[in-house]
UniProtKB/Swiss-Prot annotation:
One of its GO terms (molecular function) is DNA binding. It comes from Escherichia coli (strain K12). Pfam families: HTH_25, RodZ_C. Cytoskeletal protein that is involved in cell-shape control through regulation of the length of the long axis. Disruption phenotype: Affects the lengths of both the long and short axes of the cell, but especially the long axis. Cells become shorter and fatter and form round or oval shapes. The deletion of both zapG and rodZ genes causes synthetic lethality. Residues 144-167, 208-218 have a biased composition (Polar residues). Residues 168-207, 219-235 have a biased composition (Low complexity). Residues 133-337 are periplasmic. It is a single-pass type II membrane protein. This is Cytoskeleton protein RodZ. The helix-turn-helix (HTH) motif in the cytoplasmic domain of the N-terminus is involved in the formation of spirals to maintain the rigid rod shape. As this protein is anchored in the cytoplasmic membrane, the HTH motif may contribute to protein-protein interactions to form the RodZ helix, which is localized beneath the cytoplasmic membrane. The C-terminal domain may be critical for determination of the rod shape by probably interacting with enzymes required for synthesis of the peptidoglycan layer, including PBPs in the periplasm. Belongs to the RodZ family.
Length: 337
């Protein structure tokens, strides 16, 4: 009878109460049980008070209770009915997994990026080609226009040019024809050309005595000499001396151009006068003189070599870009665009 009564009394007690009673019978404290089971004191207290911590899974709680029962010498079979009530097994909530592949997403993104890159590259190449074609076409049109304009100017000048007839009238008296005074520096008071004793050849009355404009002025210190002496045959004497004739000096601002291929060219000086405008053929050369600075338009810069003030002019920047050269040569030989 006593055994059955004890058994019924144990069944009436909860799992936590039975564990607490067994611990007290063994003289153990909650701190000692927690140290032996490697648990927190709060966890031991919750087990004895039949509390199930919310942050503790039921599987772990069952394991702690079984360890506690073995420590206080209580059979596990006696605690199983109470465990079902105190720590029932709860179904774990598993979040549904998304069925996608990170590799596929990355590969798809890389594909779009590569497509966009190729598209941008094709657009840039197309725009560059269109710009080059338009620039080349504009240069060709400009060269053609300048060549046509030059041809029109040349044809207009040829139509306006007329030959001036010489005055061949026979009414001119050869005796009245006189020569300009020769450039003679004398210190004597009277200078007269001696008469020619030898017979002179007959002179056509229609011919006029022409004196070169390069003769200098007469600078005398006494009475001027007679302008002409008539020979017995009526021929005008030749001047005996042409002092003071100066040799022409080369212009330091001369523009020298040598052509290695056919090239259209236009040169204008500071006064706006066109020194040259037209087409120059291969192996040709051109020597121009005017008032600096010069403005040049060259259709093919690679086909011409320019020297200004004895120094070559650099056209490499126009040759590299294959453009019509527009430059100005000033007195300091600094070509400007």
């Amino acid at each position: 009878m006593n055994t059955e009564a004890t058994h019924d009394q144990n069944e009436a007690l909860t799992t936590g109460a039975r564990l607490r009673n067994a611990r007290e019978q063994l003289g153990l404290s909650q701190q000692a049980v927690a140290e032996r089971l490697c648990l927190k004191v709060s966890t031991v207290r919750d087990i004895e008070e039949d509390k199930a911590p919310a942050d503790l899974a039921s599987t772990f709680l069952r394991g702690y209770i079984r360890s506690y029962a073995r420590l206080v010498h209580i059979p596990e079979e006696e605690l199983l009915p109470g465990l079902e009530k105190q720590a029932p097994l709860r179904a774990a909530k598993v979040a549904p997994m998304q069925s996608f592949s990170l590799g596929k997403r990355r590969k798809k993104r890389d594909g779009w990026l590569m497509t966009f890159t190729w598209l941008v590259l094709f657009v840039v190449i197309g725009l560059s080609g269109a710009w080059w074609w338009q620039d080349r076409k504009a240069q060709q049109e400009e060269i053609t226009t300048m060549a046509d304009q030059s041809s029109a100017e040349l044809s207009s000048n040829s139509e306006q040019g007329q030959s001036v007839p010489l005055n061949t009238s026979t009414t001119t008296d050869p005796a009245t024809t006189s020569t300009p005074p020769a450039s003679v520096d004398t210190t004597a008071t009277n200078t007269q050309t001696p008469a020619v004793t030898a017979p002179a050849p007959a002179v056509d009355p229609q011919q006029n005595a022409v004196v070169s404009p390069s003769q200098a002025n007469v600078d005398t210190a006494a009475t001027p000499a007679p302008t002409a002496a008539t020979t017995p045959d009526g021929a005008a004497p030749l001047p005996t001396d042409q002092a003071g004739v100066t040799t022409p000096v080369a212009d330091p601002n001369a523009l020298v151009m040598n052509f290695t291929a056919d090239c259209w060219l236009e040169v204008t000086d500071a006064t706006g006068k066109k020194l040259f405008s037209g087409m120059q053929r291969k192996d040709g050369n051109l020597n121009l003189t005017g008032q600096a600075p010069y403005k040049l338009k060259i259709g093919a810069p690679a086909a011409v070599q320019i020297q200004y003030q004895g120094k070559p002019v650099d056209l490499s920047r126009f040759i590299r870009t294959n453009q019509v050269a527009r430059l100005t040569l000033n007195a300091e030989q600094s070509p400007a665009q």
